[in-house]
């Protein structure tokens, strides 16, 4: 884990990466973001949190399925690495 809270939000539908989404996936992506918000509330991340979507090899993606990292419960740094 990269933070005390490190969650992954994945769609059931297989989408390889953010670069592979289509206009048909707009509702699905919105649902994923609403899920992030609800999880942030559930895990009491009221001081803030970071969301990350790594895309393809140079973007740091190592799992070939779209997912959002939700990181919280620590002060985030910039640049991330």
List each language-model region with its residue ranges.
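HIT superfamily nucleotide-processing domains
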Residues: 1-81
């Amino acid at each position: 884990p990269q933070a005390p809270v490190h969650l992954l939000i994945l769609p059931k539908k297989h989408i390889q990466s953010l670069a592979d989404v289509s206009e048909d996936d707009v509702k699905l992506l919105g649902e994923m973001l609403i899920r992030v918000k609800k999880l942030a509330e559930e895990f009491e991340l009221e001081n803030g949190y970071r969301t990350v979507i790594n895309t393809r090899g140079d973007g740091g993606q190592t799992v070939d399925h779209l997912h959002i990292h939700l990181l919280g419960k620590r002060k985030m740094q910039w640049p991330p690495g």
